[in-house]
Structures are given as C-alpha cells and as structure tokens.
Amino acid sequence: TDEITSFSIPKFRPDQPNLIFQGGGYTTKEKLTLTKAVKNTVGRALYSLPIHIWDSETGNVADFTTTFIFVIDAPNGYNVADGFTFFIAPVDTKPQTGGGYLGVFNGKDYDKTAQTVAVEFDTFYNAAWDPSNGKRHIGIDVNTIKSISTKSWNLQNGEEAHVAISFNATTNVLSVTLLYPNLTGYTLSEVVPLKDVVPEWVRIGFSATTGAEYATHEVLSWTFLSELTGPSN
C-alpha cells in the first residue's frame, strides 16, 4: 500500500496541536511567528509527526508538495536579517547555529552528518558563502548553508509570499516557486538525491533567524502532501 501523509493548516491557532516549537517559535491568533523584530534570535516549528520520505526495502522515494504563505517584515524595510527556511531534517532535529546559518546548519563546508535539505529565503549577505553579487536570494541547501543553486530575489517587505515546493521522486528534482500578490514571481529547481542525504524518516518544518539586523518572520498557512509508493508485489 502507498503511504500518504497530508495536512492542511489554513490558519494557525494559539494552541496549534500538531506543531513542535523550538527556540522562539510560537503561534498566536491565525499565524505562526518564528522571530519577532529583535536581535540574535532563532525560531523553528516542526510538524509533529515524522514523515516516511524514502524506504530502504523498496528504494522508493516519496513525491511531495508543500505550500505556505510567509511574511518578512522589517521595521524600517531596509536593514533585514537573516532569513527564513523550509527544511527536511532527522526526526530528532534541534536548532542549529543562528544568524546567517538560519538555524538549520552549523557551517559552510559540506557535512553529510547534517542529513538536512533546506530551501532558504536569505535576506542578508554573508560574504563567506553567499552569491558574490550580494543580493537577497532563494537557495537550495544540501548539508551546508552554501547553496547548490540560487536565484536572486527582491524581498517585498511586509507582503505575503506564496510559496510552493515540490519534489519529483522520478527525476529527483526539487522545485521552488514564490509569488507575491503583485504577481512578481521567482522559480528555482535543482536535482537533489534525497535518499542519499536525509534519513528514511524525517521531520519537516520552518526556521528563521535574526542577527545584528532583524525582522519578524511569520507563516500564515501551510499544506503538505507526500506519497510513498509501496512494494509492487
């Protein structure tokens, strides 16, 4: 039988039951707040149930799609840090280094023990690993904060960013689309050999960080659907 995991959170509740909060993450009426506009914070929120993302017996990998709306709001609209991610990590995942590491990684060198894939929405230029053009960007990260693929992105401060992320298990392509209400859009895709990177069972979630500069990072809604094909007996 196929394993299907599906959930939809059209808006968050103060006592949201199916989330695990880490660092500064919490829910209020209708939204998930990862960071407030204060310096040097890390906030994360995970879906409470582990997800079976691949199966060692069959070798099968799940197809999945997740959609969410997030808002980054910096008080002055200009000095913004550090960014927001959707990530896939081991079931026992804990907050990692803050600041430019976005709460999901601890270094810029490839670390296979991290077993983490993230899609980052990076608002602050870290010269040691970010694209040399110095621009804000969307990135796909595999076991390191240094993205394997990036797309420059103009943050619309305080606006709702509508995101869809999907993984095609046949092609191993991870695709990201971001759309603002004024129809400015961005797309990015890259091959990610998921079963060579993450454990069979994972947690999924969001993280956000601030540093010397800051912003509020909020999620307004979240859906997820994965399908892992069972043995073909």
UniProtKB/Swiss-Prot annotation:
A Pfam cross-reference name: Lectin_legB
Keywords: Calcium, Glycoprotein, Lectin, Manganese, Metal-binding
InterPro entries tied to this protein: ConA-like_dom_sf, L-lectin, Lectin_LegA_CS, Lectin_legB_Mn/Ca_BS, Legume_lectin_dom, Leguminous_Lectin
Glycosylated residue positions: 168
Residue numbers binding Ca(2+): 122, 124, 126, 130
GO molecular function per UniProt: carbohydrate binding; metal ion binding
Residues bound to Mn(2+): 120, 122, 130, 137
Subunit structure: Heterodimer of an alpha and a beta chain.
Protein family (similarity comment): Belongs to the leguminous lectin family.
Additional remarks: Binds one manganese (or another transition metal) ion and one calcium ion. The metal ions are essential for the saccharide-binding and cell-agglutinating activities.
Entry protein name: Favin
Organism expressing this protein natively: Vicia faba
